[in-house]
A protein has these predicted regions:
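Bulky hydrophobic segments
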Residues: 1-120, 125, 139-153
Length: 153
């Protein structure tokens, strides 16, 4: 039974990673905006380095475009949330909460940087905040549940 659970967990984790890569880099037929000119443009006009700027703009726009605002915030909260459960469940080296959270934080920042450098999406510090928050909540739930199981055993 334990081996079956490991196989299922690893399979679900692999599928999640595949879907995550697709959503982050290949949805909507994205293509890289090449060259330094593209990067300088993205840095100047398409990147947000100010924490909560995008979140505040969505909050301000709730009465005009509620669907876009809600979908963006909830989508960013949910995007990395499964990672908070699947990573420690599938990878024994990630069975410590701080190690898991640090790894995922670095991963999220790296994803945003790749999006900026390649022009596959945009860099937004609020995406980092929301992605990490969703992940941290699920990570806390995972470690809370698994520590209770270990206490009972």
């Amino acid at each position: 039974m334990k081996k079956t659970r490991k196989i299922v967990t690893a399979t679900v984790f692999a599928l999640y990673i595949f879907l995550l890569i697709h959503v982050l880099f290949f949805r909507y037929g994205r293509s890289a905006a090449a060259g330094i000119d593209g990067l300088s443009y993205r840095l100047k006009y398409a990147a947000n380095f100010v924490p909560f700027k995008t979140i505040r703009s969505y909050a301000a726009a709730m009465h005009r475009i509620p669907r876009v605002a809600v979908l963006n915030v909830i989508g960013n909260l949910a995007l990395f949330a499964p990672m908070g459960i699947l990573l420690p469940a599938a990878v024994p080296a990630m069975r410590r909460p701080m190690r898991t959270l640090l790894f995922i934080f670095v991963l999220i920042v790296a994803v945003e940087c790749v999006q900026l450098l390649l022009g596959l999406g945009s860099f937004d510090v609020d995406d980092i905040i929301l992605n990490f928050t969703g992940c941290a909540v699920c990570c806390a739930i995972y470690f809370s549940v698994t520590s209770r199981k270990n206490d009972k055993a």
